[in-house]
Structures are given as structure tokens and as C-alpha cells.
């Protein structure tokens, strides 16, 4: 594999906080953002519009509201956390499109982006795609 192939492959499966923020700012995200941390961590602050679905709860039944064509961007606490990787593996096993947001919540805060504090999680019955603008 040459350098071009390597970096193109990385971009196929990774995004960063800046790109996600710009997509949200422009109103054009074509993916669902999943915060795969605990409900407590999510409630303390998360990426605006993100849905809380801890990585261990990523199963087909919990994704039924989203068409198979929907892509997901997952994040966890940050580079010290492998929750986003675990979530990406689960989504990929379910043949779902997925990218990991590099930096996670630590990167989001480092970049100075705003946090949302409202609760919107699978446990509270908000896993219906309504916050994403993507048709269910």
C-alpha cells in the first residue's frame, strides 16, 4: 500500500471534530452522530444533535428507526477511550456505514465547540432520527 492509498483509506473511515462542526454549522450533515459514552457522560455535555447509544447497546433492534443507507459518525471521550472503535466495529458488523470522529469529546472541547446539555438518548426514547434531519 502506498501513502495515497493509506490516507484515502483513513479518510474513508475517519472524520474530525472540525469537519463535523462545519457540517452541523452548514446544516448539511448526511449522517447520524452517535455519542457512545454513558448516559451520565452524555448528559454532562455532548455534540449538538448527537444521540446517546452506548457502544454495548448497538444492536440492530436499536437502529431499526434508521434506514440501512444511513451513515453514522461515532465518538467517545477522546483518544484515551476505545468506545468509538468498539461502536464502529459493532456498526460495521451490522453492515452499517460508519466513521469515527477523531478526538472525541476531548477534541470537541479542545477546539472550543459548543456543547448541548439536553438529554436525548435511546433510553429516553429519542432514537427515532428526529434530531438528525435524516428520514427514518
Regions found by a protein language model. Give the residues of each.
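Flexible, polar/low-complexity N-terminal or interdomain linker segments that lie immediately upstream
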Residues: 1-41, 117-136
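Short active-site oxyanion
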Residues: 27-33, 48-49, 71, 96-97
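A conditional alpha-helix N-cap/helix-loop micro-motif detector
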Residues: 13, 52-55
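Short loop/helix-cap segments at secondary-structure boundaries that form the rim of catalytic
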Residues: 42-48, 108
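Short, hinge-like loop/turn segments at secondary-structure boundaries
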Residues: 51, 69, 115-119
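Catalytic cysteine-centered active loop of the rhodanese-like fold, especially the PTP/DSP P-loop
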Residues: 63-109
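Glycine-rich, charge-decorated loop segments at or immediately adjacent to ligand/cofactor-binding or catalytic sites
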Residues: 109-115
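Alpha-helical scaffolding within the catalytic cores
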Residues: 57-62
